[in-house]
Amino acid sequence: EVDIKAYQNNWDKGGNVTFIPTTPIIREKPFLFIGDDGRYKVFRPALKHEHKGVSYSRTDMGEGEILDLLNEFYVVKPGVSAEYMNKQLVAGKHLLITPGMYELSEPLHVTRPNTIILGIGWATLIPGEKNSDTAILVEDVDGVTIASLMFDAHYTSNTLIQVGTEKTAQRHTQNPILLTDLFFRIGGFRPAKVHVDRAVELNSNDVIGDHFWIWRADHGVRGSVGWEINTTRNGLVVNGDHVTIYGLFNEHFQEYQTYWTGEHGRAYFYQCETPYDAPSQEYYMSENGTRTGYAAYKVADNVNTHEAFAFGIYDVLHNEIMIENSIEVPDKTGIRMYHMCNNTLSGGGAK
C-alpha cells in the first residue's frame, strides 16, 4: 500500500517530487507461478482504472485469468525458428520465450486477440539479416500482451516492434494492448553497419506502455557505434490515439527521440539523453534545416490534446551543437505539460 501522505508535489518549492494519486489505466504484466496442483501456470492480472499500487500480493493474486502453461503456451527454447513460433501463434498458443538470442527470419506475427508473448531472463529477439521488417508485428486486435523482452538490432529493419499496421478508428477501450518491460538496443553488439528507421511504432489506439528502455547505443564493441554506423531516426513514434505510457526511457536517436502524432496521449515520467555524437550542427537540424537540433519530445502540430508529467532531458555533447528546444508541443489549451526540466551536463556543446 502506498502511503500518499509521504509524498507531495513540491516543484513549486524547488523540489523534485511529482505525485500522481492514481494510475488512470494499467494492467500488471503476466507472471509464471506453480498452482496448487503442482503445474506451471501463467496469471494475467485484470485491467485496472484509477488504481494505486500493485494489483497482487504474496497472499492474493487479485482479479485476473489463470492459464495452464503446458496446455495454452508454447515454451520457446533457443534454436526454435520464427516460422515455427508463428505456426504456434496461428494454432492459438501463447509464447513463453526462455533465455537466449533468437534471430528471426520473419516477424513474429500476432493476429489473435488476447495473445501473450512473455519472455523470461534475457530472451532477446533480433530481426534477422533477411528480415527487413520488424521483430514483432501486432495486428490491430484487442488484449495482446508483449512483456519482458529484449530487442536487439544487428542488421537493418524498419522497426523492432510495430503495433497496428496503420492508424485506424478502431478502439480497444475495454481490452487494450499492453506492452511492458521492453528493452530495445540499436548498435553496440558487433562492429558493422546497423540501421533501424524507428525502433518502436504504435499505430493502434488505447495502447498501454509500462516501462520502455529504447537505446541507440553510445558504447559497446569497438567499431559498433558512431553517427554513420548505428543509425536510427526515432526511438518511439506514437500515431495511435488514447495511448498511455509510463516510465519511458529513450536515448541518443538522430532525429526526434519521441514523436507523438496521436490525440489524447499521456506520458508519465520521461528520461532522455540527446545523442552525443552529431559530427556538426549541419547534421543535426530539424524543420527542414531551419531549426537547430531536434526536440527530445515532439508532439505534432496538429495534435489538440496531450498530457505529460515529470520529464528529465539532458545532453552530453562531443561537439559544438545547439538544440533550440528540448520539448516541442502545440500552443493549445488541450496540451498540458507538468514538471519539465532539462540540463547540459558536460562536453563541448551548448544547449
Predicted segments, located by residue:
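Extracellular/periplasmic carbohydrate-active domains that bind, remodel
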Residues: E1-K351
